[in-house]
Amino acid sequence: MEKTYNPTSIEQALYQTWEEKGYFKPHGDTTKESYSIMIPPPNVTGSLHMGHAFQDTIMDTLIRCERMKGKNTLWQVGTDHAGIATQMVVERKIAAEEGKTKHDYGRDAFIDKIWEWKGESGGTITKQLRRLGASVDWDRERFTMDDGLSNAVQEVFVRLYEDDLIYRGKRLVNWDPKLHTAISDLEVENKDTKGHMWHFRYPLADGVKTADGKDYIVVATTRPETMLGDTGVAVNPEDPRYKDLIGKEIILPIVDRRIPIVGDEHADMEKGTGCVKITPAHDFNDYEVGKRHQLPMINILTFDANIRGAAEVFNTNGEPSDAYSTELPAKYHGMERFAARKAIVAEFDELGLLEEVKDHDLQVPYGDRGGVVIEPMLTDQWYVRTAPLAKTAVEAVENGDIQFVPKQYENMYFSWMRDVQDWCISRQLWWGHRIPAWYDNQGNVYVGRTEEEVRKNNNLESVIELHQDEDVLDTWFSSALWTFGTQGWPEQTDDLKVFHPSDVLVTGFDIIFFWVARMIMMTMHFVKDENGKPQVPFKTVYVTGLIRDENGDKMSKSKGNVLDPIDMIDGIDLESLVEKRTGNMMQPQLAKKIEKNTRKTFENGIEAYGTDALRFTLAAMASTGRDINWDMKRLEGYRNFCNKLWNASRYVMMNTEEQDCGFNGGEIEYSLADKWIESQFELAAKAFNNHIDNFRLDMASNTLYEFIWNQFCDWYLELTKPVLWKGTEAQQRGTRRTLITVLEKTLRLAHPVIPYITETIWQSIKPLVEGVEGETIMLQALPQFDEANFNQEALDDIEWVKAFITSIRNLRAEYDINPGKPLDVMLKAANAEDAARLEANKQVLMSLAKLESVRVLAADEETPACATALVAKSELMIPMAGLIDKDAELARLDGEIKKTHGEIKRIEGKLGNEGFVAKAPEAVVAKEREKLEGYKETLAKLEEQKKTIAAL
């Protein structure tokens, strides 16, 4: 083994070996239990972020554990075509490099351009996944636009259409005027904005008056421009001010349209004026009111969100209607929506119909990708009827076929599924799965897998022109088929039988609706077991928290606080990190602030920590469902942990290589410490497996840390030294054998979390351990609890020995006794058991506690002035005469006491200041109180020590 642990020199070559040798593949023995995980497919455009690294570490740990249990494991890998995201990247690229738009290319050539770009850049994320040590089966890598998945997507669309679960309708959607596509509710970001509420007078028709004698009513709106499309005014049927006006009409200013006053609960008597303008084609609530009262829908906007030259008028079923004129005032034609808002307010003012304008706080919907205000738009879209599908999907969670970890996320899932809306699945993009529907020149629609099939099924002659729907399917439609589409469905393949349903889905809470729920609905509709029972896509949904920065803020490019996991593996200098965080920003004005913060937080850049340290940190922070504040100090701590394991392994090798480890005959005598470390290992193996089974990777990692650092390195290696130096041959054989076998088992136990370092060390020690065969640690058995190796008595005895040694070390520190000075120690034994323990472990105690002598006091023996400590129920005593300079020690203690008094006074003064307590953040005040308690405890200890020294 190399003298120092250098992850850079081992990781990439080792991964290449694993991949080339095919260790990641399922072993194919179907008599053994199978276990599968389908990776949430990252965007093909993307690169690995901390969230990926976190979830991939969790999945890899789980899959490596199950592989080591001998199961037939598959970790299915793949990437998502990511419709909008990918199209935007390529559109930006051709605009920047060639000054062209997608229309300059045309649909087919532009799609070719995207495939070309995917070929060049699409591999970034999979290369990075390899750097993390992800043991996925690369031979089965899938892409959501590959032939197999495209066939599955077509099949699902056609079957849903045939089952009357897909329909086409004119409905309101969230329209992104910049990207020119519908987007889902979940892609809309509502931003709090300071705006206005305009109060307009709408004149009543036919001489009608209000209860208080006015010939108009006042409506309040935040969107004046949409009044051009009003087809009604709603009042609450219980409102005494207006209930007599229900059924009457108003004359809509500017366009002179007669529209009815309807009674509807949507109008709130307490809010605004109590009268609400109804624009069914431009507001989701109004759309519902319009349907209830059969109000026509008038679309006044183009897809660019400009005022149309002529309106479109439809009835509530979305069919063209002549209920109203399509004319709109000429001066507004082609006007941008917010310019039209100003102009319409000005015209109302000129007409004397602007009652008042009030400041108003409102939420404005923005597209999370396009970044512009979203417009509710009446368009022809394809929809999935989700209610029938949702019923089965809810039952699967209710009856426990699918479990959420943590369980509280079930409630989030239920609340969404029980109020599920039909799912708009069409997108006005070019990149994606094109909708398998064709139209003739009369507007008839035909759905089928191919144009040939459509013609054949509908007896359409070749002279009848057909053109395919221009739209593509929502990206989430194809990713909803991920668990079964990747395994060969609609064919009934062996893979589908063996690996479906998958065992666990590891995902963030933010896509429970987008993806998890839709996967459950789609899978249960299309995949059935041999008894015809719907199959779930996975048995467990493990929901992780988000990784935030050290201050608890979400990591984002605009905040400049994103950490790249690869930078923590390889390291990055400060200038490159600044450039990475401030280059190519959407908001360049933030660059200076980001640079300043980066230079402050990472003065020397980021050093290389290696993959294992990163993985261990991520696993150790994986408390279920909680958000995680990233902490570079913990990463440093776990890199030190890897160093510790490396150095401990070198110690074991130095003491076992070319030595007699008792594998070739000869007498073997195991020490108490040997039996103890075996027992400690069994407890660690038991705890580790339990924690993994319960998805508590944080606790599993803590178990490894506690055992390797505290028990194996800090105690057991020290306890072996007296035996290796002075023990008999039989004792040395026992200790060497224990050293090498426990290390080998420990490497296997830790391998799922830290695969590189464990494989490297294991390859070095493998020849030294009897019965260990095989080319790689990853196909060895994961240790399980073995009762035969467990010895409770040895555990109890060594805990006593540890307490004895720790007490001596603490007393040396307390009384400032030189750590290397041999001491005479006595034990006032509380019972025969403690006396026997002292005798049995005398050699170890004298060696590790650096003692001149140690003995049990006789029952009636007088004792000189001693420093004392309790070990179990017995009293440990160190005679102090001659050990310390009494006067100097008292002077030192007086100095410490004075200093501590000063600190107490200072903090009490601070906390007594009402201004400080009132103004300082709660956390700061709490910290000061904590400090005060600490100083008070220190003072009590110092005064106790002074008393003891004074009595010498």
UniProtKB/Swiss-Prot annotation:
Record's GO cellular component, any one? Answer: cytosol
Q: Which EC number(s) are documented for this chain?
A: 6.1.1.9
Instruction: Give a yes or no for keyword Transit peptide in this entry.
Output: no
- Where would you say this protein principally sits, based on its record? cytoplasm
Coiled-coil features, chain-numbered ranges: 888-952
- Gene Ontology BP annotations: valyl-tRNA aminoacylation
Under SUPFAM superfamilies, the record lists: Anticodon-binding domain of a subclass of class I aminoacyl-tRNA synthetases (SSF47323), Nucleotidylyl transferase (SSF52374), tRNA-binding arm (SSF46589), ValRS/IleRS/LeuRS editing domain (SSF50677)
Residues noted as binding ATP in the record, renumbered to the chain: 557
Q: Which GO terms fall under molecular function for this chain's record?
A: aminoacyl-tRNA deacylase activity; ATP binding; valine-tRNA ligase activity
Which CDD domains does this one have?
Anticodon_Ia_Val, ValRS_core
Give the catalytic activity: tRNA(Val) + L-valine + ATP = L-valyl-tRNA(Val) + AMP + diphosphate
Top EC category: ligase
Output the InterPro entries linked to this UniProt entry: aa-tRNA-synth_I_CS (IPR001412), aa-tRNA-synth_Ia (IPR002300), Anticodon_Ia_Val (IPR033705), M/V/L/I-tRNA-synth_anticd-bd (IPR013155), Rossmann-like_a/b/a_fold (IPR014729), tRNA-bd_arm (IPR010978), tRNAsynth_Ia_anticodon-bd (IPR009080), Val-tRNA_synth_C_sf (IPR037118)
Keywords on record: Aminoacyl-tRNA synthetase, ATP-binding, Coiled coil, Cytoplasm, Ligase, Nucleotide-binding, Protein biosynthesis
Q: Where in this protein would one find the motif 'KMSKS' region, according to its record? A: 554-558
* PROSITE patterns on file: AA_TRNA_LIGASE_I (PS00178)
Motif stretch ('HIGH' region): 42-52
Q: Which Pfam families match?
A: Anticodon_1 (PF08264), tRNA-synt_1 (PF00133), Val_tRNA-synt_C (PF10458)
Locations listed in the record: Cytoplasm
> How are the domains described in the entry?
ValRS has two distinct active sites: one for aminoacylation and one for editing. The misactivated threonine is translocated from the active site to the editing site.
The family assignment reads: Belongs to the class-I aminoacyl-tRNA synthetase family. ValS type 1 subfamily.
Q: How does it assemble?
A: Monomer.
The protein's role, per its UniProt record = Catalyzes the attachment of valine to tRNA(Val). As ValRS can inadvertently accommodate and process structurally similar amino acids such as threonine, to avoid such errors, it has a 'posttransfer' editing activity that hydrolyzes mischarged Thr-tRNA(Val) in a tRNA-dependent manner.
Q: Indicate what this protein is called per its UniProt record.
A: Valine--tRNA ligase
Per the UniProt entry, what species is this protein from, by scientific name? Vibrio parahaemolyticus serotype O3:K6 (strain RIMD 2210633)
